[in-house]
Amino acid sequence: MNVHRVMIGTAGHIDHGKSSLVRALTGVDPDQLKEEKERGLTIDMGRSVLELPGGGKAGIIDVPGHEKFIKNMVAGSTSVAVALLVIAADDGVMPQTREHLEILSLLGVRKCVVALTKVDLVDPELRELARQEAASFLEGTPYAGSPVIPVSSVTGEGIEEIRRALAGIVGETPPPRAEGLFRLPVQRVFRKEGFGSVLGGVPVAGRAKKGDLLEVLPG
């Protein structure tokens, strides 16, 4: 099986449907924290595996869209190679849409697929205007010309097209280097009873195996 270590990261304004899209693509609810479910928004990063056409796989990280959790968004994007930018057709380009795109560009993420979500809520005319706005928004950025795909997590429209577009980009994206020193940016820390502090992240270089001694920096 062709298993990629390439990571896809969601981006976009709060309530534009990032978590719902990830759920439709993977079958996994990325919002696992009790507070996330109670408040209906993503606070920490959710992780899942995306099955791609042709038998491949890629990791997918759902990052927060709310401005209060922008530091979590940055942490989640450090290992991302492909962006899945979510723009709601009934709302258009919003402040966090712009902010997230700038952050992704600064972090060196060079590939992007735009999901024009919630198209089931708008009429054909508004849908086309939203598509044109999204394409125009990308002009003058590293993501100009990226595909803009209408999608609905409710009806299922566009889900397979999104999956195919991501598969094409992932297939062209080299995975992180397997040689050299093992490096893993710490993206989350949590405590587990009986284990203590547990660090989470995605390797960007090298390999590690059970029993290896790792150094945490800065010390």
Range-by-range predicted roles:
Residues L21-A24, Q96-I103, L129-F137, E161-I169:
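Alpha-helical scaffold elements adjacent to nucleotide-binding pockets in ATP/GTP-utilizing enzyme cores
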Residues S136-G219:
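Conserved catalytic-core segments of large NTP-driven translation/proteostasis enzymes
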Residues M1-V63:
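Conserved G1/Walker A P-loop phosphate-binding module
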Residues K57, V63-K68, S77-L129:
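Conserved Switch II/interswitch segment of TRAFAC-class P-loop GTPases
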Residues D15, L21, G40, D62, ...:
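Residue-level signature of catalytic and energy-coupling elements of molecular machines
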Residues V3-I8, L104, V119, T155:
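Conserved structured catalytic cores and adjacent interaction surfaces
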